């Protein structure tokens, strides 16, 4: 077979695997869309449909790993006790980061909070249900099979910033992504993608990125009541944005478009970049060869 298809070891080149993933994903829509429509016709709301796109991406990923004669766990989904601990750790860190950002906005006079009279543990649980599926979906898409093939094919120095740009661009169509807000939101989203990418590289697992992503969104929306990436949320608290610039408060896009989010995320990226991680250095080198 011509070298354009296979490398010196006789394996299909990573670019073709990325194209295969995209092709299988597009083909899956022939089944996904009718199934989604049928479920909606039977009364399933958006809340209960949340697992459906995740199931679809998992199946596409599974098929690609089967074609490579690898287990699904090879993409960072080794569902064991260590994996669960990393998810929990990530959720705690992600929540703490968002609480720090909210506190900085509050101290700067950008927001006030009131308790929601209708608050309940059920609302927090509903938020957890929603955001766990969001985290799973976006991490599988942006830190899963495609990202890992990109690392194998080009190295992390190109794969990390490229996927960060794609992750940010994917949010450009969200509500509130306009004017100066777009600059700050794009910058912070790229930093967030770098953080999540390094979280995968330092652990060899999607557990920590999923936990970080979930904790960030859950604390931001379900707990603090901020908009999340431009989408309104009902939280335990009711935030009221005060008369301050949008670059300070994040505006209707949410705290992700705040300069404080940029500073906190940049600090987190620096810390995780300096962290040696839990993956043996030999494994990392082979991944970047």
Summary of predicted features, one role per range:
Residues 1-72, 76-79, 83, 220-289:
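N-terminal, membrane-interfacial amphipathic/helix-forming hydrophobic leader that caps
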Residues 5, 34-49, 70-140, 147-153, ...:
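Juxtamembrane helix-loop-helix connectors linking adjacent transmembrane helices
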Residues 15-19, 47, 51, 87-92, ...:
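Hydrophobic alpha-helical transmembrane segments
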Residues 24-31, 95-99, 103-104, 164-174, ...:
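Aromatic-anchored segments of alpha-helical transmembrane domains
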Residues 98-99, 131, 135, 156-172, ...:
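Small-polar-interrupted transmembrane alpha-helices in polytopic inner-membrane proteins
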Residues 110-117, 173-181:
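Membrane-interface helix caps and helix-loop-helix hairpins in membrane proteins
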Residues 137-162, 175, 198-205:
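Membrane-interface helix/loop boundary segments of multi-pass membrane proteins
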Residues 181-246:
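Functionally important transmembrane alpha-helices
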């Amino acid at each position: 077979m011509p070298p354009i298809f296979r490398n010196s070891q006789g394996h299909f080149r990573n670019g073709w695997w990325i194209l295969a993933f995209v092709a299988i994903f597009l083909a899956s829509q022939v089944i996904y869309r009718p199934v989604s429509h049928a479920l909606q016709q039977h009364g399933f709301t958006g809340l209960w449909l949340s697992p459906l796109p995740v199931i679809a991406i998992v199946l596409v990923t599974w098929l690609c790993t089967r074609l490579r004669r690898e287990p699904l766990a090879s993409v960072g989904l080794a569902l064991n006790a260590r994996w669960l601990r990393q998810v929990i750790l990530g959720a705690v860190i992600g929540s703490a980061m968002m609480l720090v950002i909210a506190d900085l906005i509050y101290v700067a006079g950008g927001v006030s909070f009131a308790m929601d009279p209708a608050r309940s543990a059920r609302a927090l649980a509903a938020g957890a249900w929603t955001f766990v599926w969001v985290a799973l979906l976006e991490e599988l898409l942006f830190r899963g099979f495609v990202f890992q093939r990109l690392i194998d094919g080009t190295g992390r120095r190109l794969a990390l910033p490229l996927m960060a740009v794609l992750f940010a661009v994917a949010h450009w169509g969200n509500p509130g992504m306009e004017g100066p807000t777009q600059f700050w939101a794009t910058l912070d989203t790229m930093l967030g993608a770098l953080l999540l990418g390094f979280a995968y590289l330092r652990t060899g697992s999607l557990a920590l990125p999923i936990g970080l992503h979930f904790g960030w969104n859950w604390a931001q929306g379900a707990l603090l009541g901020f908009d999340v990436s431009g989408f309104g949320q009902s939280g335990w608290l009711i935030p009221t944005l005060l008369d301050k610039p949008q670059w300070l408060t994040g505006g209707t896009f949410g705290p992700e478009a705040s300069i404080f989010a940029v500073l906190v995320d940049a600090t987190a990226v620096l810390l995780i970049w300096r962290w040696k991680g839990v993956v043996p250095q030999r494994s990392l080198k082979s991944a970047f060869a």
